[in-house]
Amino acid sequence: MFINQIGGYRMQTDLIQELTEDEMPLFPLEVVLFPGGVLPLHIFEQRYRLMIQYCLDNDRLFGIVLIKKGREVGEHAEPYLVGTAVKIIEVDQLEDGRMNLITLGQHRFKITKIRRDLPYLVGQVRALEADDTEPPEDAEMPGVRAIQLYRTYESLLAELSPQWKVVEEIPTALDHLSYQIATRLQIPLTDKQQLIETVSIHQLLGREIELLERENRRLKISLLARRSFEKHDTNISPWKNASLN
């Protein structure tokens, strides 16, 4: 049996090959990625170099999962159980062994069991795909409403933050729309995790409509406050020509 040692990790090479079709290498991070999302990654830890090399050699996906407890670097972190499988679409392998990757979110999954006998986590997973991606005849309004609120949200953010780039294309397919909205929403990661765990696309879109309505109200208040402040010419401050001497 060939023993491979990489960066201090000694392991049986043939053990890695025993991953079944329903097993997936896991990468716990401080990020929630949705299907269709692009995620650049810089791989420097030896265990994840090993994981990425395995995925490249075997044409395998790996899973991006939000950290529930622990840190990205060091000991195995405890992940949330729902994440997104990603495909490596571009890789730049550096001379010192580090890698720069571009990954693309493929589909959601749920972890049913975690293996901890390898340098990196491996999850036994099942696909978490909604069966209501096509709206019934009486359910078109949520998509229309979501797009209206989403456009307003993007415009408000762009006005408040010049560095914010308004999205150019908004999909009309409900699943793609809901994933894009979830990606763009500037909300806490735990709130995003709740979104990714919502299996039904209609329920996900309904939750996003609530969030967009809330965030739009908040952004409008911030914008009104800024405009009100800007109306007052600071040059007429009574302290302008005052001297402390």
Which residues does each predicted region cover?
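N-terminal low-complexity, acidic/polar interaction/targeting segments
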Residues: F2-N245
